[in-house]
Design a protein with these regions (language model features):
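Sec-exported extracytoplasmic/periplasmic mature domains
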Residues: 67-74, 98, 102-112, 119-126, ...
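C-terminal regulatory/interaction regions
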Residues: 112-170
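Short acidic-hydrophobic, aromatic-tinged amphipathic segments that line or gate anion-handling sites
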Residues: 1-5
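Solvent-exposed, non-transmembrane amphipathic alpha-helical segments
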Residues: 62, 66, 82, 89, ...
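Metallo-beta-lactamase
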Residues: 8, 15, 20-106
Length: 170
């Protein structure tokens, strides 16, 4: 079964709500809410203790998805990446997304190129999270969102950028 928007099913005796929240990480992002169990399965909307990677965007959809998860009556949140969390984990991912959006916008508006911008964004508040080099993809996606047609979308180029940043940070 495919769906758009929201789809509710009864599985056994449990109500299960499937909610479309993308595109964000990819074009087909959805979460699953089991209200009776106060549990949300977020798929790739949440990366806990790791830098998320924005392949599709727009990033505003991802921020909105985090906001929506925060409104659900859920105490158990199962991310697509990393350990189970609570709403504090959702808030940290949201904080990261807002931060990189705002920092990338400043650099874009100042005329800085996407790779240079990715290199210059401090990630101190997210130290200890894995895969910091993903900032390269995130900034390129944001630059395209800001209207910069020169920011690459080719996965091969973006993986090359991530490799450069990984080497730079070691």
């Amino acid at each position: 079964t495919t769906f758009k928007g929201q789809l509710t099913r009864i599985v056994g005796s449990k109500c299960v709500e499937m909610i479309e929240v993308g595109p964000a990480h990819t074009g087909g992002d959805a979460i699953v809410h089991a209200p009776d169990d106060r549990t949300v399965f977020t798929g790739d909307i949440l990366f806990i203790n790791g830098h998320p990677i924005v392949w599709a965007g727009p990033i505003g959809n991802w921020i909105s998805a985090c906001d929506m998860i925060m409104t659900l009556d859920a105490e158990n949140i199962v991310p697509g990446h990393g350990p189970a969390t609570d709403k504090r984990g959702v808030a940290r991912v949201r904080d990261y997304l807002v931060y990189i959006r705002d920092e990338a916008r400043k650099r874009h508006d100042a005329g800085m190129g996407a790779l240079e911008a990715a290199r210059s964004i401090a990630l101190d508040d997210f130290e200890g999270w894995g895969d910091a080099e993903r900032i390269a993809v995130n900034v390129a996606t944001l630059y395209r969102e800001f209207g910069d047609a020169s920011a690459p979308s080719d996965a091969g180029v973006l993986f090359g950028w991530m490799a450069q940043l990984w080497k730079d940070r070691k």
